[in-house]
Amino acid sequence: MVLIEQVVLVASILITFGTCLAATKYAARLFPHFEPLQFYDEATNPMELNIVLAFVVGLIGSVVVLLYFDSQKIKPVLNPTQWQQYRLMEKQKLSDNTALYRFKLPRSNNILGLPIGQHISVQANMGGKTVVRSYTPTSSDDDHGFFDLVVKSYEQGNVSKYIGSMKIGDLLSVKGPKGQMRYAPGLSRHIGMIAGGTGLTPCLQIIRAALKNPADKTQIDFIYANVKETDILLKDELDELALKHKDQFRISYFLNEAPEGWKGGVGFVTKEALEKNLPKPANDIKVLMCGPPPMIKAMTGHLEALGYEKPRTVSKLEDQVFCF
């Protein structure tokens, strides 16, 4: 409940109680200097104090109920200017060095409050130095009481290594939201996506949002590149979404080290692969990218050669090519 609501509530209680008390002789007894203001008469029922007390009890009960329902409201917890700590409640291994981490929100009806396509800042103390990195939760505001991060822990990493070492019950410092992307139905007629490794996370957030909304007709083509097949994150979910929404969502996998019998792309993503799998350049399409810097640099060059607009250093929502 915001401060102004609290002030109004307290003022209403005091005014109501004062008015009720003024209707009885007890106001004059409690506050003699207010006696000229009393408007009772001598014929007042001797049970009037009980009436006042019953009214007050009822009023207090109403306030308690009001506060209870206020506590049950779905409330976002993120604060863009203040670090807040959330406790690790689950850890699920996805690959050799990648896991899904589930963090508990203060209440079961809380939501993170993250616009689709935006991310959070995560803070860790490493060797006496504070390090901050950005991550995109794979959960959404449809998920109450928790949020999920998919993190690949690198041996030479900072925050990723810190998260990888966390144990159940440990606390993580978070603030946000931040970022220029804010997805909504109708943002583009057709979206192409290019991701490498954990660059999947902002793309997946948008994919889920678009496909679960029957009114959202956005076409999505997704190129997802990894080193090995075991590096492909959440593949079962991606394949299920592609099968269930085959008229709207298509995914193309690329591996540097493809196993025997692999039916997807092999090697680095080429200009020809982009031309084949992405929407053609137009005013009503977007290409979203997230991955390692060398990959993004290579993809940017390929896209420019194919006639797409050159992305800005810091992408904006209106850009045709957007880099997370």
UniProtKB/Swiss-Prot annotation:
User: Membrane-spanning regions, if any?
Assistant: 49-69
**Which GO annotations describe the biological process of this protein?**
protein histidyl modification to diphthamide; tRNA wobble base 5-methoxycarbonylmethyl-2-thiouridinylation
Identify its membrane topology class: Single-pass membrane protein
Q: Which reaction does this enzyme catalyse, per its entry?
A: 2 Fe(III)-[cytochrome b5] + NADH = 2 Fe(II)-[cytochrome b5] + NAD(+) + H(+); 2 Fe(3+)-[Dph3] + NADH = 2 Fe(2+)-[Dph3] + NAD(+) + H(+)
The alphabetized UniProt keywords are: FAD, Flavoprotein, Membrane, Mitochondrion, Mitochondrion outer membrane, NAD, Oxidoreductase, Transferase, Transmembrane, Transmembrane helix
Cross-referenced Gene3D superfamilies? Nucleotide-binding domain of ferredoxin-NADP reductase (FNR) module (3.40.50.80), Translation factors (2.40.30.10)
Query: Cellular location of this protein?
Result: Mitochondrion outer membrane
Question: Any one cellular component term from GO for this entry?
Answer: mitochondrial outer membrane
Occurrences of domain FAD-binding FR-type (ranges): 81-184
Q: Provide the GO MF annotations for this entry.
A: 2-(3-amino-3-carboxypropyl)histidine synthase activity; cytochrome-b5 reductase activity, acting on NAD(P)H; NADH dehydrogenase activity
Keyword Membrane, does the record have it?
A: yes
Tell me its cofactors: FAD
UniProt cross-references to Pfam families, sorted A to Z: FAD_binding_6, NAD_binding_1
Q: Can you tell which superkingdom this protein's organism belongs to?
A: Eukaryota
The entry's FAD-binding residues are 164-179, 190-222
Q: What is its EC number?
A: 1.6.2.2
Q: Pathway it belongs to?
A: Protein modification; peptidyl-diphthamide biosynthesis
PANTHER family named among the record's database cross-references: NADH-CYTOCHROME B5 REDUCTASE (PTHR19370), NADH-CYTOCHROME B5 REDUCTASE-LIKE (PTHR19370:SF184)
| Protein family (similarity comment) | Belongs to the flavoprotein pyridine nucleotide cytochrome reductase family.
Q: How does it assemble?
A: Monomer. Component of the 2-(3-amino-3-carboxypropyl)histidine synthase complex composed of DPH1, DPH2, DPH3 and a NADH-dependent reductase, predominantly CBR1.
What protein is this chain from?
NADH-cytochrome b5 reductase 1
Organism annotation: Mycosarcoma maydis
